Amino acid sequence: MFGFRLSVLLFAVCSLSACSCMFVNSCKYPPSQWCDSRDIAAQCGVLEQCMKFNASPVTVSLYYESLCPGCREFLVSQLVPTFIMLSDIMNIELVPYGNAQEKDDQGNYTFICQHGEDECRGNMIETCLLKALGPKAIPVIFCMESGADVLKAAQPCLGVYFPDTTWDSVMKCVTGDEGNKLMHQNALKTNALKPPHEYVPWITINGEHTDDLQDKATNSLFNLVCSLYKGEKPAACGQGLKKRTNSYCMN
């Protein structure tokens, strides 16, 4: 895939003008190394193209609760559909915790969740899924959050996407020390937000939260990601995906 994209880059540069192609032909480096450094790219006449080629993906972090209606709406109608269409230019970070409270009992943590014990269990299941599966957990969590009952959907959703991952292995994390420590890390990450979160869903873009970014993300995350990406826009950005989310769970 990397070689193919560089071949496309070479073709594009040579198509610009005969002069550009002569510049490339005088380059001392093979095409596979053109974008290895800014100096090499400049010497080979492809600096602008390499800057687009090497553009960092937009990172969208969602601080949320598994049973918060507004969180579920944003995740199901905005976040995951946008990721499906723009996965080449976008990363997702999910942090299930939200407006929960944590109590430390000599290194063993207990949690009080805004929507009760079921939400604490949902948060823990999704946290353990993320630990076990990494980004591949996203469709499982989407399946859970789009169901009528998040908790009842968890095991069937896992079975659909990862039949080789046992439910017992997930529950071992949920009920054990591993899940407890993972949720503590979610608490630390949420409580370290600057500015502090006031509600959920709380969205950061490349680690930054502003009222303007939050409003744009909930109005059309798709358009926001396309507008912020510094590289060459994928064809999907010529389309649109809009559905405003204005429901929040206040802290």
UniProtKB/Swiss-Prot annotation:
Transmembrane segments: none
Localization terms from the record: Secreted; Lysosome
Positions of glycan attachment: N108
Lineage, opening ranks: Eukaryota, Metazoa, Chordata, Craniata, Vertebrata
Function as written in the Swiss-Prot or TrEMBL entry: Lysosomal thiol reductase that can reduce protein disulfide bonds. May facilitate the complete unfolding of proteins destined for lysosomal degradation. Plays an important role in antigen processing.
Induction comment from the UniProt entry of this chain: Strongly up-regulated in spleen and kidney in response to bacterial lipopolysaccharide (LPS).
Family indicated by similarity: Belongs to the GILT family.
Enzyme class, spelled out: oxidoreductase
GO cellular component, one term: lysosome
Pfam families (alphabetical): GILT, SapA
UniProt note on tissues of expression: Highly expressed in spleen and kidney. Also detected at lower levels in liver, heart, brain, intestine and gill.
Signal peptide (residue range): 1-21
Organism: Carassius auratus (Goldfish)
Protein's recorded name: Gamma-interferon-inducible lysosomal thiol reductase
Predominant cellular place of this UniProt entry's protein: secreted
